[in-house]
Every structure is written in C-alpha cells, then in structure tokens.
C-alpha cells in the first residue's frame, strides 16, 4: 500500500500489524519506480502513524532508536543480513560508519556488507544510509542524492541539539 502524507508518498507492506517493508518518502513521480502498490484513499490509523514516523525519520526529526520502539516491525532476512542490520542499528544519529568497519566486526568483506544493506527492507528505520565507503558516500538503493540529503539533514539537526 502507498500512503500520501503532505507531498510525499511512502510504500509499506504489513504482515498483520507488523511492518515488513517500506520505502523512504518519495515524490509521486518517484514512488512507482520503487514500489508497485496502490495509493490508499483513506489509510487506516496504523498506516498513517507509521507513515508519519517514516517521514519524521526522513527529515531527521526523530531518532531511529525511538522509531523502532514506536513501530511493530518484523525482519524477514537471512541470518547474515540480520547480523549486518543489527550492527547498523548501533550507529548513532548524525554519525557514519564505513562498510569496512562493519565488515571487520563481522569478519567478512565490505562488499558482503554492501550486498546485505541493499536488502534492508526497512530503510530509515534501520539506518543503512549511515554506512559509507572509505572515500565516498558509497551506494544507496534510492540514489546517492537521497543518501546525501538524509545525512545532511541529520548533521543539521545534530548541530541544533
């Protein structure tokens, strides 16, 4: 399902009441490139609540640790991907860690970490955007400009705290 909040659209998939996949907030022309769902005319309260939390994460108005406490979610990923995502959850708001740093902790390669992060079903909620390459931003499923925007928003909000 796709929920519209203000000028943004957020794709979400639920299993019962648990969120299992979401997109980052996207403009209307972008949403269908990443998500082939139906825009809900009247989304239920749960969808709106989760959508608003994801929008706050996008604009760095909410810490992901708080969001994970507010959203009932389920990770359906391989055990390796789960280990990578568990490491990513430890990255503090406004900070970044390299693919190599995570790879060392898990005794694997930076490329394997990148592949696991590309399978993150809950972007922003699990902040894979905070993982960067040694000398660049690295990749991001929604494009490098989106990753740059999210990281810049977090830096601005961190300085204002």
UniProtKB/Swiss-Prot annotation:
Q: Which SUPFAM superfamilies match?
A: Methylated DNA-protein cysteine methyltransferase, C-terminal domain
Identify the catalytic residues. 128
Q: Which GO terms describe its cellular component?
A: cytoplasm
User: Which keywords describe this protein according to UniProt?
Assistant: Cytoplasm, DNA damage, DNA repair, Methyltransferase, Transferase
Reactions catalysed: a 6-O-methyl-2'-deoxyguanosine in DNA + L-cysteinyl-[protein] = S-methyl-L-cysteinyl-[protein] + a 2'-deoxyguanosine in DNA; a 4-O-methyl-thymidine in DNA + L-cysteinyl-[protein] = a thymidine in DNA + S-methyl-L-cysteinyl-[protein]
Recorded hits in InterPro entries, A to Z, give:
MethylDNA_cys_MeTrfase_AS, MethylDNA_cys_MeTrfase_DNA-bd, MethylDNA_cys_MeTrfase_DNAb, MGMT, OGT_N, WH-like_DNA-bd_sf
Protein location: Cytoplasm
Instruction: Note the Pfam families from the entry.
Output: DNA_binding_1, OGT_N
- Which Gene Ontology BP terms does the record give? DNA alkylation repair; methylation
Question: Cross-referenced PROSITE patterns, in alphabetical order?
Answer: MGMT
Q: Which family does it belong to?
A: Belongs to the MGMT family.
* Additional note from the record: This enzyme catalyzes only one turnover and therefore is not strictly catalytic. According to one definition, an enzyme is a biocatalyst that acts repeatedly and over many reaction cycles.
Role: Involved in the cellular defense against the biological effects of O6-methylguanine (O6-MeG) and O4-methylthymine (O4-MeT) in DNA. Repairs the methylated nucleobase in DNA by stoichiometrically transferring the methyl group to a cysteine residue in the enzyme. This is a suicide reaction: the enzyme is irreversibly inactivated.
Protein's name in the database: Methylated-DNA--protein-cysteine methyltransferase
